[in-house]
Amino acid sequence: MGCFFSKRRKADKESRPENEEERPKQYSWDQREKVDPKDYMFSGLKDETVGRLPGTVAGQQFLIQDCENCNIYIFDHSATVTIDDCTNCIIFLGPVKGSVFFRNCRDCKCTLACQQFRVRDCRKLEVFLCCATQPIIESSSNIKFGCFQWYYPELAFQFKDAGLSIFNNTWSNIHDFTPVSGELNWSLLPEDAVVQDYVPIPTTEELKAVRVSTEANRSIVPISRGQRQKSSDESCLVVLFAGDYTIANARKLIDEMVGKGFFLVQTKEVSMKAEDAQRVFREKAPDFLPLLNKGPVIALEFNGDGAVEVCQLIVNEIFNGTKMFVSESKETASGDVDSFYNFADIQMGI
């Protein structure tokens, strides 16, 4: 048998024309579309307005460096974004699956959403932020933060493509690696700060094609008060369970409560186990245990005098038939909030 196969191969070689070369093997990685790094960077620009439209970055890494007095808009999701040595720039970044890292930047105004946010060796940044984990600053000063506030039609899908939840936003819970005694290197922007005064909608013909809105009630990310001092000693916790209309119901409830003068303090989307539910929901836990397997829950904290009573009325009138956890009374509500968010912070490693 060995001789037979040997002769067969020899015959094949002899029958092949002399000028016919053997084709190289094709591998799947050879067939991938080649990526030109220049398509995913802005470098050395001055006094320009530039950007990328939805679908043009598609999850790639992006680099912005050595830009001065530029307006930069990335209307797409990306893997990571590094911003180095930029001065007096306006920057918008669509959802970033990983980290956004500012280094040695000055006098920049930004709106962005990401999994991780880090600033090092920077001065005077104003950032409207959605960040899933605790933002970190290092060797930096005069960094100001506000809550992400932005809309365009493709943005919700880009959040999903980047693996980010619009309800996981720790924009105001800042960690300073290098605090200075007696000084504060960061602060919160005024609550009435208008995002368009900092990061205006682009006006160039190409970028105007993206239908942007900065109206608060259209923002993809719910606008929360975060670490600001609460206006009342009464809060109310609402927990919505996974289903076809959970996000829509959460948005509707936020609109109703904010419309009646209450404040949205914080939001969270996280998976719960039975033992977690027992600690948070206590005697009501058995009612919700069957719902935990459907997916993560969404929690909302509202604040204001009468928040518990009004929230109960809205849930009963508008969402009758949809199971939700709502704090029972003003007296128990603060414990509900603490129990849930302590659990959520541990779960998410914050």
Curated annotation (Swiss-Prot):
Membrane topology reported for the UniProt record: Lipid-anchor
Gene Ontology CC: centriole; ciliary basal body; cilium; cytoplasm; cytoplasmic vesicle; cytosol; extracellular exosome; Golgi apparatus
Location(s) in or outside the cell: Cell membrane; Cell projection, Cilium
Domain of life: Eukaryota
PTM section of the record: Myristoylated on Gly-2; which may be required for membrane targeting.
Impact reported for G2A: Loss of membrane association
Sequence ranges assigned to domain C-CAP/cofactor C-like in this UniProt record: 24-179
Effect of R120H: Reduces affinity for mouse ARL3
Binding residues annotated for GTP, in chain numbering: G98, S99, Q115, Q116, F117, R118
Xref: SUPFAM superfamilies: C-terminal domain of adenylylcyclase associated protein (SSF69340), Nucleoside diphosphate kinase, NDK (SSF54919)
Basic and acidic residues compositional bias, start-end: 11-31
Biological process (GO), any one: post-Golgi vesicle-mediated transport
Lipidation (S-palmitoyl cysteine): C3
Annotated segments matching region Disordered: 1-31
Pfam families: TBCC (PF07986)
Biased composition annotated in UniProt, kind: Basic residues: 1-10
Covalent lipidation (N-myristoyl glycine), chain numbering: G2
Tissues of expression: Ubiquitous. Expressed in the rod and cone photoreceptors, extending from the tips of the outer segment (OS) through the inner segment (IS) and outer nuclear layer (ONL) and into the synaptic terminals of the outer plexiform layer (ONL). Also detected in the bipolar, horizontal and amacrine cells in the inner nuclear layer (INL), extending to the inner plexiform layer (IPL) and though the ganglion cell layer (GCL) and into the nerve fiber layer (NFL) (at protein level).
GO MF terms, alphabetically ordered: GTP binding; GTPase activator activity; magnesium ion binding; unfolded protein binding
Record's keyword terms, sorted: Cell membrane, Cell projection, Cilium, Disease variant, GTP-binding, GTPase activation, Lipoprotein, Membrane, Myristate, Nucleotide-binding, Palmitate, Protein transport, Retinitis pigmentosa, Transport
Subunit description: Found in a complex with ARL3, RP2 and UNC119 (or UNC119B); RP2 induces hydrolysis of GTP ARL3 in the complex, leading to the release of UNC119 (or UNC119B). Interacts with ARL3; interaction is direct and stimulated with the activated GTP-bound form of ARL3.
The protein's role, per its UniProt record: Acts as a GTPase-activating protein (GAP) involved in trafficking between the Golgi and the ciliary membrane. Involved in localization of proteins, such as NPHP3, to the cilium membrane by inducing hydrolysis of GTP ARL3, leading to the release of UNC119 (or UNC119B). Acts as a GTPase-activating protein (GAP) for tubulin in concert with tubulin-specific chaperone C, but does not enhance tubulin heterodimerization. Acts as a guanine nucleotide dissociation inhibitor towards ADP-ribosylation factor-like proteins.
UniProt disease link: Retinitis pigmentosa 2: A retinal dystrophy belonging to the group of pigmentary retinopathies. Retinitis pigmentosa is characterized by retinal pigment deposits visible on fundus examination and primary loss of rod photoreceptor cells followed by secondary loss of cone photoreceptors. Patients typically have night vision blindness and loss of midperipheral visual field. As their condition progresses, they lose their far peripheral visual field and eventually central vision as well.
Family assignment from sequence similarity: Belongs to the TBCC family.
Protein's UniProt name: Protein XRP2
